[in-house]
A protein has these predicted regions:
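Loop and turn regions of beta-sandwich accessory domains that flank beta-strands and are enriched
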Residues: 526-670
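Flexible, small-residue-rich helix->loop connector segments that border functional cores
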Residues: 157, 172-182, 209, 213-235, ...
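Substrate-binding/access-modulating region of protease and related hydrolase catalytic domains
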Residues: 163-165, 210, 222-226, 240-345, ...
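Extracellular S/T/G-rich loop segment that most often corresponds to the catalytic His/Ser-adjacent loop
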Residues: 173, 331-449
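Extracellular ectodomain surface segments
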Residues: 29-66, 70, 554-556
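Active-site-proximal loop motif in hydrolases
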Residues: 137-179, 190-228, 241-254, 277, ...
Length: 670
């Protein structure tokens, strides 16, 4: 009996072991614990954006911990490694959310708890509408949607971290609102300049919109700040020079804005989104040539980059509509990229404009001096706000910053440009109606800023080479304009469409070498080491030995030859300096240049609108027309310059040349 009681006592004690006051059991039942996480993600919007972190917890018992996603985000998707806690969070495209929450479960196999991961999403609310950056057919506020795929392909360059950081871009324009909420952080106020009052604030003084502010927004609107859209080179440094302000456009100011002043002498890229008001084929102006030539000395001798808009006179040239009647009827350009002497020479990169469907913008000038084309859009109106509009009026424009203050505007034309009724532009500080080659130029300037960040050693000619090599053949099936309507059934080609030259480059007077591709250009710039040797040039003169009357109403034409034997082999540019004694009107004339390889470039097509207040221009004096169509071809050999007169004999005087009308051909190359 005694032994039985002892055994019972042991049994009772065993049953009592591990009760509520036992510390060992309390420790075993505690779950893993750790701090919540607060993370931040810059949302690219044009490509997947991802962050990586680690959920760090500990278990009181030192037991293994298992991780899992209990509740995923609504803007993005999280994954986690089940044993290490390595967390990845991805937003696939744009999101309107500024915050997302993910719950991570942690378990030791006995108990579990949650860790809250809060992600602040830094976005730009208008970026899905900015088709020029990334075009998936999303609304740009116009009635017509963009056609998916027609964009500058910036995504790859941005994903690699190229943002324009460290590159200085001058906006040579009407002004620049330096306090704009989406520009201020990128503006170098100390190196900006106001030509009207000598201050460093080029913000416009008079009421109204500001062209330069919109241009600056395309280049360098600030990213990831929850405001507006995004610039192509969203970390570039912007400077404003209000050369185009009323009363500021002197030759001295022009030079100072382009590198001749201390505040502009260290600029990398000059953006010139302007055109001449002249409707004539002008003589070259040596003073402008000298200013452009000075830019060659900048960037430590590598040359600053001059980006110039190609002009907006395809169907309207000056204030006399009649000068464009024939050009419009035959579908050729009334104006030309050659109508502004400030675009002269081999330095400027002249850019045309492309619409959101990948074809030439309705207004964009054609010309042999174009280098590439970039998005310029159309007019951005919406019939919900402006009934009765159609065609290019309701096709997408470019979305960018605009001068703040609704008192500067008077019309509602779409849901963004709605006098402050849009929460996205309550102060009218953003627009969806910016267009023109004025928009194409800053788009290209932004891409070049990305290229220079990728490779600061690029010279200006290296930049041009890379752009030509990487441009896309947009509107690839375009065949040009050939008609039998001019010469009583005889076929005449006024525009050749796409032509492949003897060096393998495709070229078009509508698009230059094609549409700029940011990712391809930056990829090429990164690995570029075969820098072009010094540029050389050769020139030759030719003239008719006696008075030459060009055959009228004929494809026979009159021809001059130039025998070129330069020390260099490959052509970069060809420039003709032209003189013509008399013409019934330059609209009758076509001028073509043919290389030794047989490539033809139309320097000036017939039916152009060259005139003076509606009166046809009837002579040419020392005018320079540049062609890029021969890029990479062999320079040596016989070049031919051909002049035509397609007007009937009943129209005015004959096209004629005197022996003193000297024609010059200048080739540059390496």
């Amino acid at each position: 009996m005694k032994y039985i009681c002892v055994a019972l006592l042991v049994l009772v004690l065993s049953a009592c072991k591990g009760g509520d006051n036992d510390p060992q059991l309390t420790i075993q039942e505690l779950p893993p614990t750790g701090p919540n996480l607060d993370l931040t993600l810059n949302v690219l919007g044009v490509a997947p954006s991802m962050l990586s972190s680690n959920v760090s917890v500990s278990d009181p018992q030192g037991l293994p911990i298992a991780y899992s996603i209990v509740q995923n985000g609504t803007a993005g998707t999280a994954t986690i490694h089940p044993s290490s806690g390595a967390l990845t969070y991805t937003v696939s495209a744009h999101t309107d959310q500024s915050r997302d929450v993910v719950l991570v479960g942690v378990s030791n196999g006995k108990q579990s708890s949650n860790v809250t991961v809060t992600i602040t999403l830094k976005i730009d609310p208008l970026i899905p509408n900015q088709w020029h950056l990334h075009n998936v057919g999303y609304s740009a506020f116009a009635s017509t949607l963009p056609v998916s795929g027609n964009d500058m392909n910036v995504a790859g360059a941005w994903r690699e971290g190229f943002t324009g950081k460290g590159i200085k871009v001058a906006v040579v324009d009407s002004g620049l609102q330096i306090g704009h909420e989406d520009l201020a952080a990128n503006v170098d106020v100390a190196k900006s300049f106001n030509f009207l009052n000598g201050s460093n604030d080029p913000s416009p003084a008079a009421a109204g919109s500001d062209h330069g502010t919109a241009v600056a927004g395309i280049i360098g609107s600030v990213a990831f700040n929850g405001k507006g859209g995004r610039g192509v080179a969203y970390e570039a440094t912007l400077r404003g020079y209000n050369l185009l302000a009323n009363g500021a456009s002197s030759l001295t100011n022009f030079g100072n804005a382009l590198g001749l002043a201390p505040y502009s002498s260290d600029v990398d890229i000059f953006n010139e989104s302007f055109d001449s008001s002249s409707t004539q084929l002008p003589p070259q102006v040596n003073s402008y040539n000298a200013i452009n030539a000075n830019a060659l000395t900048l960037r430590g001798g590598k040359g600053a980059i001059l980006v110039q808009s190609g002009g907006n006179s395809f169907s309207s040239f000056g204030n006399v509509a009649a000068v464009c009647t024939q050009a419009k009827a035959f579908g050729v350009s009334c104006g030309s990229t050659s109508s502004d002497t400030r675009r002269d020479g081999t330095l400027p990169i002249v850019v045309g404009a492309i619409a959101a469907d990948g074809t030439k913008s309705s207004y964009s000038n054609a010309g042999s001096s174009l280098w590439v084309a970039a998005p310029g859009g159309e007019f951005g109106r919406n019939t919900s706000f402006v009934p009765g509009q159609s065609g290019s009026s309701i096709e997408p424009a470019i979305i960018t910053a605009s001068r703040s203050g609704c008192n500067n505007y008077s019309n509602r034309v779409n849901a963004l440009d709605s006098l402050g009724s849009s929460p996205l532009a309550a102060q009218c500080q953003y627009t969806a109606t910016m267009n023109g080659t004025s928009s194409a130029a800053p788009n290209l300037s932004g891409v070049i800023a990305l290229m220079l960040q990728a490779n600061p050693n690029l010279g200006y000619r290296d930049v041009k080479y890379i752009l030509a090599k990487t441009a896309k053949k947009t509107d690839p099936t375009r065949t040009g304009v050939t008609t039998t309507g001019l010469l009583n059934g005889t076929s005449v080609t006024l525009d050749q469409g796409w032509v492949r030259n003897a060096a393998g480059y495709w070229f078009s007077n509508w698009y230059g070498f094609g549409a700029v591709d940011a990712t391809e250009a930056v990829s090429a710039a990164k690995i570029y080491i075969n820098f072009l040797p010094a540029m050389e040039s050769v020139s030759s003169n030719s003239n008719f030995s006696s008075i030459e009357n060009v055959p009228q109403y004929s494809t026979a034409g009159s021809t001059l030859t130039f025998n070129m034997n330069p020390a260099f082999t490959k052509v970069e540019h060809a420039m003709a300096i032209l003189n013509m004694n008399d013409s019934p009107g330059l609209a009758c004339n076509q001028i073509e240049l043919i290389s030794p390889s047989g490539t033809k470039s139309i320097l000036m097509h017939a039916l152009n609108g060259y005139s003076n207040n509606g009166v046809p221009q009837q002579s040419i004096t020392n005018s320079r027309i540049l062609s890029n169509a021969f890029y990479g071809e062999t320079a040596a050999g016989t070049w031919r310059l051909k002049f035509y007169d397609f007007c009937p004999t009943t129209v005015g005087s004959r096209t004629s040349f005197l022996p003193t009308d000297i024609q010059s051909l200048i080739l540059t190359g390496h």
